[in-house]
C-alpha cells in the first residue's frame, strides 16, 4: 500500500520520476546513435534515475544497454571484474550464451565463474590477470566483440565513474580505457558520477586522457513549475492535498 507521496535516497522510476524530458530525449538519441556521453551534475540531482530510465527506453532487439555501478571498486582488477560481469550478464539472454561469450572472448584470461541460485542473475567473475598485461584489452573489448557477434549495438553506462581517479596509476589506467574505447564502432559509453569536481577534472582537464571523450551534458535544476506539478500530483495520488501555492513555497524554501 502506497501512502507516502515521495521516495527518498534511492533511484526513482515511474510516477516518482519527474520532468527531465529534454535530457531524456537527448540521452536516448545519443544511445541510439552510438554517441559517447558524459553526464555531470551535483549529487542528488537525479542522474542515476535519469540514466536508468533511458536504459529502459533504449533497450531493443538491436540495442543492448549495460549498467554498472563502480562505487565499490578500489582497483583496476575490481573494475575489470565488475565490467566483465556486467557486460556478459546484460548482453546475454541465456546462461549458455554468456558462458560461451566468456569462453570465446576471455580465453587468454581464464576467468573463474561462480554461480548462485539463479545463474542468469546471480553470478560473479574473478579474472586471473596482470592489469599491466595486454590481456586486459580483451575485457575492454567485450562490448564491441559481443555487439559484432550478435549484429547489434551496445551502450555501457558506468555510474560513479569518478572512482577511477582514486586508482593507483590512474592516469595510465585512463589512457588504456580511452585508447580502446575510442576506436569501437558498435559500442558506446555513458559515464557519470556523484562527485562533480572529480568528474569535471576527468573530462575537462586537457592533460587528462578523457578530455573531449564525448557529448558532455550538464544536468540543470528541475524548474519550480515542474516541481509544483509533481508535488501536487504525488499528494493527490496518495489521497492527500496540497495547494500549488504551498508547494511553490516549499520549492523556494529548499531552493528546488
Residue ranges and their predicted role:
Residues 29, 56, 60, 85, ...:
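Short, well-ordered alpha-helices that flank and scaffold nucleotide-derived cofactor binding pockets
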Residues 61-65, 185-187, 212-215:
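Short glycine-/polar-rich loops that comprise or flank the Walker A/P-loop
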Residues 1-37, 42, 240:
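A short, basic N-terminal segment
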Residues 201-252:
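Helix-loop-helix "sensor" segment of P-loop NTPases
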Residues 126-195, 204:
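Conserved Walker B catalytic segment
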Residues 34, 71-75, 161-163, 194-198, ...:
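Conserved nucleotide-binding/hydrolysis micro-motifs of P-loop NTPases
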Residues 42-45, 49-154:
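P-loop NTPase nucleotide-binding core
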Residues 254-256:
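The conserved phosphate-sensing helix
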